């Protein structure tokens, strides 16, 4: 099964902080897919680890690459990218 990936811009003011990471992990775990997030500096974490995502230190204005593999990879990738593009549903 091919791996899909997409680059997305972190737009929310606080970046990929704890609350945003929890939302991303919960969403990622709802799909039958393995998702990874790669920061601009090349560090990578699986999307099922809040601590791993926090260690990426992805801030507002930085791009991250989301990769997905598995039977629901396309849906998972689309949903996670949409969550990030919608600023993790946070009010600014």
From Swiss-Prot:
Its main location: cytoplasm. It is found in: Cytoplasm. Transmembrane segments: none annotated. GO terms for biological process: phosphoenolpyruvate-dependent sugar phosphotransferase system. InterPro entries: HPr, HPr-like, HPr-like_sf, PTS_HPr_His_P_site, PTS_HPr_Ser_P_site. The active site is at 17 (pros-phosphohistidine intermediate). Keywords: Cytoplasm, Phosphotransferase system. One of its GO terms (cellular component) is cytoplasm. Component of the phosphoenolpyruvate-dependent nitrogen-metabolic phosphotransferase system (nitrogen-metabolic PTS), that seems to be involved in regulating nitrogen metabolism. The phosphoryl group from phosphoenolpyruvate (PEP) is transferred to the phosphoryl carrier protein NPr by enzyme I-Ntr. Phospho-NPr then transfers it to EIIA-Ntr. Could function in the transcriptional regulation of sigma-54 dependent operons in conjunction with the NPr (PtsO) and EIIA-Ntr (PtsN) proteins. Belongs to the HPr family. This is Phosphocarrier protein NPr. It comes from Vibrio cholerae serotype O1 (strain ATCC 39315 / El Tor Inaba N16961).
